[in-house]
Amino acid sequence: MSKIVKVIGREIIDSRGNPTVEAEVHLEGGFVGLAAAPSGASTGSREALELRDGDKSRFLGKGVLKAVAAVNGPIAQAVIGKDAKDQANIDKIMIDLDGTENKSQFGANAILAVSLAAAKAAAASKGMPLYEHIAELNGTPGKFSMPLPMMNIINGGEHADNNVDIQEFMIQPVGAKTLKEAVRIGSEVFHHLAKVLKAKGLNTAVGDEGGYAPNLGSNAEALAVIAEAVKAAGYELGKDVTLAMDCAASEFYKDGKYVLAGEGNKAFTSEEFTHFLEDLTKQYPIVSIEDGLDESDWAGFKYQTEVLGDKIQLVGDDLFVTNTKILKEGIEKGVANSILIKFNQIGSLTETLAAIKMAKDAGYTAVISHRSGETEDATIADLAVGTAAGQIKTGSMSRSDRVAKYNQLIRIEEALGDRAPFNGLKEVKGQ
């Protein structure tokens, strides 16, 4: 009943209006899985390759017809007749057939779309929700938890057209008892933030991930306006709501210095920028910082981990790119204490699960994440619950491409009830 009989690839549009790959996997019992690959803006240099056509006459060169052709051609031929329930085998077949280190032959966007569609079809054939199937693939059947959301309510850096250097300023509704309550708190703070910004004469247009993207006097001012919004919403900062940041520091690392253009081109060494961040953590209840230095600055990251690693969660995104080889090196060297998990950085479900397992086995936390270019596909919600990862980063409280994930989490929590606890701040490293 779970043998693959047909695979279809197509070019669809993501939340930024760019093409991406969608795949359908059909099984002999009539079961179908449908999945789409997301796409990043601030990408790590060691990510698996997202294959684009480069034909400037279509979609400004961003078409994905080559990747779609790979799905409809060699990938389909290789996986038809195989058992979709054997995820590791499906993924291995595609990776081996691609034959490159970074999936550049077919594109990680092609391989991932088929990988996720196969998992969805297999779950349907087993008559179970995707999160339950993922828990079985993960070797943790029946073990679930609802993730603490990191909600990106002020966007800067590569995600917005403003003067804020740090890419994401996030809230975590740690005072919530359930995921559904966390979403409500996030929504209320989000709306109060709009009022705070408007009162200051600031822009309330939103960035790629649904957060506001105002021009501010400094990066610290983003934290100040969020603190004001939390209070206005009737919550206590540090008790009901904590803060998190994604610096995406690789984006402002120039000639060995960290240059904050939005603050008059202030330049910092690795140590100085670490202490700049440390000062912010003393002023505000920041419990998690992602990519606080450049992805290649391992000596700096080691220092940052020594200074901040026992106090807060230090998440490697561009640093680790969901890659077990790089994560292993980070664990051995004592660099960071958490990994951001993005399917499309590595390009298959099997490799994603391996990265989560490696992190957890080493005492690192794993934060499941969207990309800035998303679709209505909400698979990361099921991934977060099915691996009991504990944390999720899927944008703000606007744009359907973000909200789709929160809504799926609400549905899953309703279905699982007490079987999926919401552990809040306990999930965050160092808290």
UniProtKB/Swiss-Prot annotation:
* EC number in record: 4.2.1.11
**Record keywords, A-Z:** Cytoplasm, Glycolysis, Lyase, Magnesium, Metal-binding, Secreted
Positions with a binding annotation for (2R)-2-phosphoglycerate: Q167, K342, R371, S372, K393
Catalyzed reactions: (2R)-2-phosphoglycerate = phosphoenolpyruvate + H2O
Q: Name one GO cellular component term.
A: extracellular region
Residue positions of the active site: E209 (proton donor), K342 (proton acceptor)
Give the Pfam families listed for this entry.
Enolase_C (PF00113), Enolase_N (PF03952)
Q: Which GO molecular function entries does the Swiss-Prot or TrEMBL record give? A: magnesium ion binding; phosphopyruvate hydratase activity
What this protein needs as a cofactor is: Mg(2+)
Q: Which pathway does it operate in?
A: Carbohydrate degradation; glycolysis; pyruvate from D-glyceraldehyde 3-phosphate: step 4/5
Which amino acids does the record list as binding Mg(2+)? Answer: D246, E290, D317
Q: Does the keyword Glycoprotein apply?
A: no
Q: Which InterPro entries match?
A: Enolase (IPR000941), Enolase-like_C_sf (IPR036849), Enolase-like_N (IPR029017), Enolase_C (IPR020810), Enolase_CS (IPR020809), Enolase_N (IPR020811)
Q: Which domain of life is it from?
A: Bacteria
- What does the UniProt cofactor note say? Binds a second Mg(2+) ion via substrate during catalysis.
Q: Which GO terms describe its biological process?
A: glycolytic process
Which class of enzymes does this protein belong to? lyase
Tell where it localizes.
Cytoplasm; Secreted; Cell surface
What's this protein's function? Catalyzes the reversible conversion of 2-phosphoglycerate (2-PG) into phosphoenolpyruvate (PEP). It is essential for the degradation of carbohydrates via glycolysis.
HAMAP family under this entry? Enolase
The record ties this protein, via PANTHER family, to: ENOLASE
The Swiss-Prot or TrEMBL record describes its family as follows: Belongs to the enolase family.
Q: How does it assemble?
A: Component of the RNA degradosome, a multiprotein complex involved in RNA processing and mRNA degradation.
Q: What name does UniProt use for this protein? A: Enolase
The species is Yersinia pseudotuberculosis serotype I (strain IP32953)
Q: Which gene encodes it?
A: eno
